[in-house]
Design a protein with these regions (language model features):
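N-terminal signal peptide c-region/cleavage motif recognized by signal peptidases
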Residues: 18-20
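Low-complexity repeat regions of mature extracellularly deployed or surface/particle-associated proteins
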Residues: 24-143
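Bacterial N-terminal signal peptides that target proteins for export
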Residues: 1-9
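Bacterial N-terminal signal peptides
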Residues: 9-16
Length: 143
């Protein structure tokens, strides 16, 4: 259990801080090691950052960001996981780590300075978060 928790924390930390800051541009970093993984989405506005690491197979990551300085970090180590994140506004941050298989995480954030963290270290878990406004924080851990 500790090893899984440590691995999830390491993935979130690594992907959240791995992207370099650019003066006016967007940053997208994608690493996929297994077969049949896919990433989609888009970024509008300025200084958006997206980092995705998918180690297993048949994982899907979707991230859309609109506004300024939004950050999304998705790490999926298992297989058949879905992470679907949508952010609009300023300085919103979402981090998703799915270590097991067949997990789903869906997040929507609008406003400013909102933070969502989802860690799912099991199989077949589902989490959905919707935040609107400013300075909201949600953390979900499912073992």
């Amino acid at each position: 259990m500790f090893a899984k928790t440590f691995k999830a924390a390491a993935i979130l930390s690594a992907v959240a801080f791995a992207a370099p800051a650019l003066a006016q541009g967007h940053v997208v970093i994608v690493e996929q090691f297994g077969a049949n993984n896919s990433v989609g989405g888009g970024q509008t506005g300025s200084r958006q950052r997206l980092v995705v690491v998918q180690d297993g197979h048949s994982n899907v990551a979707v991230a859309t960001q609109d506004g300024r300085r939004n950050n999304a970090a998705i790490g999926q180590v298992g297989s058949n996981n879905l992470a679907d994140t949508h952010q609009s506004g300023r300085r919103n941050t979402v981090g998703v780590a799915q270590i097991g298989h067949n997990n789903t995480a869906v997040t929507t954030q609008t406003g400013r300075n909102n933070t969502t963290a989802i860690v799912q270290q099991t199989n077949g878990a589902s989490a959905s978060v919707s935040q609107s406004g400013s300075n909201n924080t949600v953390a979900i851990v499912q073992n």
